[in-house]
Structures are given as C-alpha cells and as structure tokens.
C-alpha cells in the first residue's frame, strides 16, 4: 500500500510519463487518467549486436538448436519449455534439434536441472549459466529461433535482440508481450503454461523454413523501424523538448 501511494503521487506530479507499450500505458492510465502518457518503445543497439565467434564450435553443438535467454525463474516459463521440448523429442520424434538455455539463476536452477534429469533430457538440453555477452549474441545468430514462454512480461528486450538477427520468436499471449511479439507477423504466441500448445508452435517453425524466414524478416524490419536505440533516443528527446516548451508557456 505504501509503495502504491508513492507511485500514485509520483505519477500525479509528473509532467509526462514514458510507457514502453500500450499495456504499460493502460496501467499508468488506470492510476491517473489525466496523466500525459507517451509511448516510447524500448530499443536495442543494433551496432552492438554483431556475432564475433562461432557459438556451435565453442559449445560443441553438432545439430540445429532453439534458444531460451533469460533468468532461471519460474515465471519465465522454463518448466513449460522443458515439458514442451520433451514432447518434441519423445512424442513428435523430432530428433535433429537441441535446446539451449542461457541465463542466470533466480532460484529455479536446481529444480530446472532436476526436471531435465527426470525427463532424461540431459543430452538434449544444454544449459549455459552466467554466459558472456558475446556468447549470447552469437547464440542468437546461430539459433533457429528464440522461445520466451514467460507467464508475464511488461516489455521484453530479448525478442528485439533475436529480431536483430532475423530470428522469429515464440512467446505467450500475456500482458505486454503481444506488443513486441505479434502473432503470425514476427512470431507465434501461445497461452502461458501450456506445453502442448508450445510444442506445436515449436514443431510448426522447425518444419517450415519459409515461415521462419518470413517471421524473422518481419521482426528485423520492426526493430530497424521502431525498436532501436536511435529511435528511442529521438522520441525521448522530443518528449523532453515538449515538456520544456509547455513549462515555458505556462
């Protein structure tokens, strides 16, 4: 309650509020409908997203792989992803694919490894803890696509980085995600915590290279037009200039 009180007071006394997408704007509007809220989308530095090494060679991966990048946390949907990958391997019998999970532990690591062992997927799933930034960047470029099966996100950056390499994204139709990952435009959205839906989406992209290319290109164009650091800086500067001009005219 105390936190909500201060958030409300800050919003009420702000000249303007920057929201990363329509979902965030709706949240702020619910707190104070009279606030000036401008959408300034998150942007990535495209110049920094350049692969400098051979990821597969470094980690001795001899097959295609799909990628997860994020915290080892329950809310990131890793459990759902592992169960979906189990369906891919053991029910759908897609054998020439591996899953790479990259990130840092947020309390779920031991449970994650336990589930991988329980499902006998230790040889099929590669977990890279505390990966160097260069390794993450090279992984984007060599992956087939990214999977972000989160239970919730506000405005995730990881899909934008994947788009920069023309890699589509499978994610969930939850909270702010659909404003970044657009279903059947630059990725595929499924319901959160639904391993069957997720496995079907994974299989769909694995079996259709033309669709992967189409969605990946759309994501690439989205980042270059709207979600890069230059656009973000220009839009932020314009907002500051508008605030200064309005204050001078008062």
Indicate residue ranges for each PLM-predicted region.
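Carbohydrate-associated surface elements
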Residues: 23, 43
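Glycosyltransferase donor-sugar binding loop
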Residues: 44, 69, 98-113
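Conserved donor-binding/catalytic core segment of Leloir-type glycosyltransferases
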Residues: 60-76, 82-85, 100
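Nucleotide-activated donor-binding/catalytic signature segment of Leloir-type glycosyltransferases, i.e.
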Residues: 111-131
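Short alpha-helical donor nucleotide-sugar binding micro-motif in glycosyltransferases
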Residues: 130-131, 138-143
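Aromatic "clamp/platform" in nucleotide-sugar-dependent glycosyltransferases that forms part
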Residues: 151
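Short hydrophobic beta-strand element within catalytic cores of glycosyltransferases
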Residues: 168-171
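Conserved acidic donor-binding segment of nucleotide-sugar-dependent glycosyltransferases
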Residues: 183-184, 188-195, 204-210
